């Protein structure tokens, strides 16, 4: 089993693609029913500096509604990525993980002349009926880590996009629960 290696340039590209994806996802009215969570939410909104490659969400949308939303986002995400990185090959593909109540998608991009591609994984889990995790609404461009990327010209998008994010307490609760339920040791 190989170990993933990330170089600094690939990490920065992945982070820019994460931000473009978040911006476009939360531009849609359906996003009122989506909450951003996990390690990347800690990275962008709660001051954690550790790179996290996945965008994790919980949602009250049906999996059919979510699949339709993801399909409708492809053009706007591609446009944002190409505006940032220039011409290249883009895909937004969904993968059936065989788990009911979950959708996994991949945003992939390779700039012309670039070896390999940059990939960001999106994971959506359906909320249990009546569940309402602790959340807050934050303007994407006001988060310090995001603001830094904007100020330094690493990403460009208009201000004002509101993102629903889990509270830090809720994210840590999820992390502890995942550790307790895990059947294997993760390095």
Where are these regions (language model features)?
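Signature of the catalytic double-stranded beta-helix
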Residues: 64-84
């Amino acid at each position: 089993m190989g170990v993933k290696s990330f170089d600094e340039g690939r990490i920065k590209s992945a982070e820019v693609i994460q931000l473009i994806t978040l911006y476009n996802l939360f531009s849609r009215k359906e996003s009122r029913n989506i909450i951003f969570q996990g390690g990347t939410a800690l990275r962008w909104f709660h001051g954690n500096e550790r790179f996290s490659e996945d965008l994790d969400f919980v949602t009250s949308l049906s999996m059919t509604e979510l699949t339709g939303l993801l399909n409708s986002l492809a053009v706007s995400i591609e446009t944002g990525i190409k505006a940032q990185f220039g011409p290249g090959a883009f895909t937004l593909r969904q993968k059936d993980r065989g788990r009911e109540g979950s959708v996994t998608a991949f945003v992939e991009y390779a700039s012309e002349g670039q070896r390999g591609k940059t990939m960001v994984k999106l994971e959506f889990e359906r909320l249990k009926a009546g569940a309402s995790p602790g959340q807050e609404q934050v303007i994407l461009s006001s988060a310090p880590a995001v603001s830094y990327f904007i100020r330094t010209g690493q990403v460009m998008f208009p201000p004002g996009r509101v993102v629903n994010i889990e509270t830090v307490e809720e994210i840590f609760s999820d992390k502890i629960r995942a550790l307790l339920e895990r059947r294997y040791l993760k390095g």
